[in-house]
Amino acid sequence: LRGKHEIVGKILEHRGLKKLLGTYIDALPLLINKETGKIHTSFNQTVTATGRLSSSNPNLQNIPIRNEDGKEIRKAFIPDDGCEFFSADYSQIELRIMAHLSGDANMIEAFKEGDDIHAATAAKVYKISIDKVTREQRSKAKTANFGIIYGISVFGLAERMNVDRKEAKELIDGYFETYPQIKEYMDKSIDLARGQGYIETIFGRKRYLPDINSRNSVVRDRTSTRLNS
């Protein structure tokens, strides 16, 4: 409904601000350790179904950054004098793992050539040279890259990109035309999960899926366990 009436955008904005207020602005000061004057999170090793670390009290893995209001929350975290915060992240690790697991020749070639994978995806989907890719096209390709490998639906992609469903469907179709072995791998993963009742990571961790045969689309997301474990 976003875009069809101005009140919808206002409601969504209100929800976002209410989330920031309740989860961060009001809650974070209450979690400051009185002795150290700092916030100390807890990292959990055996809580998530995928095997990934999670964080609680507070969840420091989920401090907002996607919009300007969220970025203001991050400004509340200040290092000690003489110290700095830094972050390290693998470059597009989920896509690299997907390229390895699926053996998709086009994606592997893009990584081997050192291409910007999002620009390379946009170039192939929109059938233009990589130097002609616009910022908007790259942004859409980035959203598609990370959404599609986790089983995002046409509706979900349309909502995330704020486009109509026709454009979202064309993007997904173009994506799988560009990376056909990824589509094949994803379909095989779902079939395998339905047959054995679980998904197994590269390192042998099993995630059992008792509702794998339901019609719920969340099944598509759960079969992505191999990517994010």
Predicted regions mapped to residue ranges:
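Conserved catalytic core of nucleotide polymerization and phosphodiester-bond processing enzymes
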Residues: 1-229
